[in-house]
């Protein structure tokens, strides 16, 4: 299908689908800032939802900086899909399904010491560690500011899923301990997955539920051990 006859649908910030519309209408939406580089768009000829900046016929409509960034993301999409095989969230998905998941998020690098999320921030995304090591810390006391390490996260681990579901605040800081590569899926992308791609969302939601249940059980066991260790039995 030629670009002139292609039609598109758009996933907007209000979590509604608009379209299909032709390329000229979509370009007008871009000029009006209704469609941004990170807005999800689905061409009629492609079953996958992608960022507008990742669609070749639309990329040139954005500023040069967005075009360069999109090209870098595109080159790394296959490696992201391969890395997502390691995460229990996506167990059972096909290669095609993982590639579609990869198109809904964004991979990026962080340097040692970089602050990824901060305590008190809104939980607007889930993060997956593709490589490197992160530290989860809690700053205790407004004056003393004691830096307490809660846990460390390495390749194949993730964080932020519970807060995203509850729409709560971050309860701790997460900082990069080494050079690391992360994959970030924000709330808007996750809602698109749930509402528009149910065949992928169903196994992902099941795996999320299983992961949360396991973590609750592990936390309960740790709490039980901490409480019982305080007693000396005769």
What residue spans do the PLM features occupy?
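Protein-protein interaction regions
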Residues: 1-104, 109-112
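Cyclic-nucleotide recognition modules
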Residues: 51, 57-60, 149-205
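Short aromatic/basic micro-patch
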Residues: 20, 92, 126-128, 152, ...
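Short, solvent-exposed loop/turn segments that connect beta-strands within catalytic domains
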Residues: 141-147
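Short phosphate-coordinating micro-motif centered on Lys-Gly-acidic
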Residues: 116-121
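A small-molecule sensor/coupling module
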Residues: 68-82, 97, 170-171, 188-228
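Structural motif
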Residues: 7, 133, 179-181
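Glycine- and acidic-residue-biased ligand/ion/polar-headgroup-sensing regions
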Residues: 113, 124-141, 155-156
